[in-house]
């Protein structure tokens, strides 16, 4: 939707976006994001799933109130709608991993003890409604752990793992599910975001992992 609107965030802090033309995205996973023309792919404000949208018609202009389970709210007051359309994009196949990233996943599945003593592999490419989790593991106490593997660990990867964790933790068989963000190099901003969300970061030494004993790449 493209609309003239104001946006207010109410939660751990407050933020206000004055009236302007903006792009509003309401995705099938429940997320809502507010975009302008000058920030590339980054939204001005957003609410990640799980969250719920209700309409408030009590004021002079209709407003959508998006609230997450923590009680934080994104209030979008619509003054004028310029464009409104709905599209079903279907199931996305996801990113195709490059050679190094795919190899990292294979190696870590074989050397899952690098994540911690007592870790065991449950499944590679554990499928969810929003895409496959790279590795689903059990820790030394039998708890579920979702692992996202990247060559370069950036904020997008942390956001991706956050979405997986939100979905997996709705599964009473798996919950509680913790997250591990594993990469060759993890940017400071991504590490800070992961830590803030309770996700553990693990730096992978690709060269060392390739030098370890691997059933797939053993010649004899």
UniProtKB/Swiss-Prot annotation:
GO CC list: cytoplasm
Enzyme Commission code(s) on record: 3.1.-.-
Major location (coarse): cytoplasm
Enzyme class: hydrolase
Gene3D superfamilies from the UniProt entry: 2.70.180.20, 3.40.1350.10
Molecular functions (GO terms): DNA binding; single-stranded DNA endodeoxyribonuclease activity
Keyword annotations of the record: Cytoplasm, DNA-binding, Endonuclease, Hydrolase, Nuclease
Family annotation (InterPro entries): Endonuclease_NucS (IPR002793), NucS_C (IPR048301), NucS_N (IPR048302), NucS_N_sf (IPR049173), tRNA_endonuc-like_dom_sf (IPR011856)
Subcellular location: Cytoplasm
PANTHER family hit by this protein: ENDONUCLEASE NUCS (PTHR38814:SF1)
Entry similarity comment: Belongs to the NucS endonuclease family.
Function: Cleaves both 3' and 5' ssDNA extremities of branched DNA structures.
Name of the protein in question: Endonuclease NucS
Protein's organism: Mycobacterium leprae (strain TN)
């Amino acid at each position: 939707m493209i609309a003239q609107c104001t946006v207010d965030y109410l939660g751990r802090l407050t933020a206000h976006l004055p009236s302007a033309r903006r792009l509003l995205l309401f995705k099938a996973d429940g997320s809502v994001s507010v975009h302008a023309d000058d920030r590339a792919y980054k939204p001005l404000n957003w609410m990640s799933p799980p969250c719920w949208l209700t309409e408030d018609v009590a004021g002079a202009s209709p407003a959508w109130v998006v609230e997450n389970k923590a009680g934080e709210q994104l209030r979008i007051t619509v003054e004028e709608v310029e464009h409104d359309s709905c599209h079903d994009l279907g199931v996305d196949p996801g990113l195709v991993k490059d050679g190094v990233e795919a190899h990292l996943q294979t190696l870590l599945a074989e050397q899952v003890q690098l994540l911690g003593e007592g870790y065991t592999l449950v499944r590679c490419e554990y499928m969810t409604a929003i895409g496959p989790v790279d590795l689903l593991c059990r820790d030394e106490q039998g708890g579920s752990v979702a692992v996202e593997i990247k060559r370069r660990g950036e904020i997008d990867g942390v956001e991706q793992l956050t979405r997986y964790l939100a979905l997996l933790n709705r599964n009473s068989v798996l919950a509680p599910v913790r997250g591990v963000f594993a990469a060759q190099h993890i940017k400071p901003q991504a590490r800070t975001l992961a830590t803030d969300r309770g996700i553990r970061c693990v730096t992978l030494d690709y060269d060392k992992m390739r030098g370890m004993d691997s059933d797939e790449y053993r010649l004899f």
